[in-house]
Amino acid sequence: SEGRQAWRTRHGIGTGDCAISLFCYEPPALPQWLAQLHAAPPAPQATHLLVTPGRAAATVQQAMASVPATEQGAVTRHALQPCPQPQFDEMLWACDLNLVRGEDSLVRALWAGQPLVWHIYPQHDDAHHDKLDAFLDWLQAPASLRAFHHAWNGMAPASTLPAITPALLKQWQECVQAARLRLLQQTPLIEQLQAFVTEKS
């Protein structure tokens, strides 16, 4: 869309470039993923990694040690500033892949309809593993997206991370957009409540 392209242009992201947003805790697989991303960027023109401030920025700074100096220029890193929610949403809509954390950002990323990876908040008893798998089941995630989630969330070795490619992103986008459509087709909550009250009265 025009708004999406305008956002990308403002941030120096060209047509045909791949833009990836990163809003995470400390993913166990981050060093492996950054090394993989720099060794084989998904876009032939340019790949941009938009890193949110705070924990994501700190963990990326540490993990970049795993990327050989000769490859560090293969991906353009953008250090983002704190921003209000509407601007965060604009970024989600404008990126080709959104790696998000927490439930609020997951919902926002689903509405954006772009490929997404969810870093679920880790719980000490690993209860989040079942929760993540339940989400992936609902999403009807293809095997590659499920494998990425498992490695990203420490449920599988980092070596099992699938490489990000244009074909993979297309498959993931189709999955997310189908899930978004299912949500849009739901009866609005107020109508569900009205029907419930009518049925009980």
Q: How would you name each of these model-derived features?
A:
Residues S1-P27:
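A nucleotide-sugar donor-handling region in carbohydrate enzymes
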Residues P27-Q36:
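A conserved mid-protein helix/loop that constitutes part of the nucleotide-sugar donor-binding site
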Residues R4, H11, A141-S201:
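C-terminal amphipathic helix plus adjacent low-complexity
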Residues P115-A156:
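Nucleotide-sugar donor-binding patch of glycosyltransferase catalytic domains
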Residues Y25-P28, R55-A57:
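Short acidic/polar capping segments at secondary-structure boundaries
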Residues P84-K131:
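A donor-sugar binding/catalytic signature common to diverse glycosyltransferases
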Residues Q45-Q81:
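Catalytic donor nucleotide-activated moiety binding site of glycosyltransferases and closely related
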Residues S1-T9, A35-A39, A43-T47, P53-R55, ...:
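Domain-scale detector for complete catalytic domains at protein termini or as standalone homologs
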